[in-house]
From Swiss-Prot:
Gene source species: Salmonella typhimurium (strain LT2 / SGSC1412 / ATCC 700720)
Protein family according to the UniProt entry: Belongs to the mandelate racemase/muconate lactonizing enzyme family. MenC type 1 subfamily.
Catalyzed reaction equations: (1R,6R)-6-hydroxy-2-succinyl-cyclohexa-2,4-diene-1-carboxylate = 2-succinylbenzoate + H2O
Keywords in alphabetical order: Lyase, Magnesium, Menaquinone biosynthesis, Metal-binding
Database matches in SMART domains: MR_MLE
Protein name according to UniProt: o-succinylbenzoate synthase
SUPFAM superfamilies: Enolase C-terminal domain-like (SSF51604), Enolase N-terminal domain-like (SSF54826)
Gene that this sequence comes from: menC
């Protein structure tokens, strides 16, 4: 006997979270809880403003329609990426497809003061990998900060994310301030330039490896082995169903590329599922999930070791 519940939620964000020149004051989303007999599965649907094609309101309409169809016995999935991902996660939990084992390691994220990152890395066991957002300030400053971090921590490897912020000139200004001896320890730089061709040229000219992120969601993108391209960064909330995520990971691995499962600033419930997906599909690769500290609360399922308060399902607004 199938049954389902849908919850709507809103989490206050820390001041200073900016996405595409727009301050994110709250993170808004939905949960779906599916039941079939004794089994239960949860999924999170939280379109990311400025990045997702769909709005939160559109996702809510699509989710409620899909849940009603599922209750009638339908087996299909919705079209919208965030809804398809959340629904497929709930189904994967319900059927036991999504393993429980999780990779709760996360590459620490530096969005501001590099001194904070140095302190966090000092306590990090094993392989030291961190992520730094670049392109928010002057390219020269970004280059100096990256150089400083690589110089200060000799066993550090950095993942950088520019979100296509730079012109070729700005990208070259960044590279100019990174010691060529340190560039090999830049694991990859996500989408440095506004176009893929400019990003490819940057990789060839500087020896700094790049990764595709936004490109994966463009209609003309194909998986290819290319000089200077080392990785793909997969954000499941923006990608679609769990099957589509699996297909992209498999396509990347077949070409010898690193596939990194990455957060779209999901709640703790969504992040714990991403940690399980990472352990399952990309074992041995540190996922990019260090975004919980941007929020003021957790929900339903806490992230291990987090001191943030965790809301229970009874405290959320139920829609169905």
């Amino acid at each position: 006997m199938r049954s389902a519940q849908v919850y709507r939620w809103q989490i206050p964000m820390d001041a200073g979270v900016v996405l595409r020149d727009r301050r994110l004051k709250t993170r808004d989303g939905l949960y779906v809880c599916l039941r079939d007999g004794e089994r239960e599965g949860w999924g999170e649907i939280s379109p990311l403003p400025g990045f997702s094609q769909e709005t939160w309101e559109e996702a809510q309409t699509a989710l409620l329609t899909w849940v009603n169809d599922w209750l009638q016995g339908s087996e299909g999935l919705p079209e919208m990426p965030s809804v398809a991902f959340g629904a497929s996660c709930a189904l994967a939990e319900l059927t036991g497809v999504l393993p429980e084992a999780a990779d709760y390691r996360a590459a620490p994220l530096c969005t501001g003061d590099p001194d904070d990152l140095v302190l966090r890395l000092a306590d990090m066991p094993g392989e030291k990998i961190a992520k730094v957002k670049v392109g928010l300030y002057e390219a020269v400053r970004d280059g100096m900060v990256v150089n400083l971090l690589l110089e200060a921590i000799p066993d550090l490897h950095l993942r950088l994310d520019a979100n296509r912020a730079w012109t070729p000139l700005k990208a070259q200004q960044f590279a100019k301030y990174v010691n060529p001896d340190y560039r090999a320890r830049i694991a990859f730089l996500e989408e440095p330039c506004k176009t893929r061709d400019d990003s490819r040229a940057f990789a060839r000219e500087t020896g700094i490896a790049i990764a595709w992120d936004e490109s994966l969601r463009e209609a003309d993108f194909t998986f290819e082995a290319e000089e200077g391209v080392r990785a793909v960064v997969i954000k499941p909330t923006l990608t679609g169903s769990l099957d589509k995520v699996r297909e992209q990971v498999a396509a990347a691995h077949a070409l010898g590329l690193t596939a990194v499962i990455s957060s779209s600033i999901e709640s703790s419930l969504g992040l714990t599922q991403l940690a399980r997906i990472a352990a399952w599909l990309t074992p041995g690769t540190l996922p990019g999930l260090d975004t919980l500290h941007l929020m003021q609360a957790q929900q339903i399922r806490p992230w291990p070791g987090s001191a943030l308060p965790c809301l229970k399902r009874e405290e959320l607004e139920r829609l169905l």
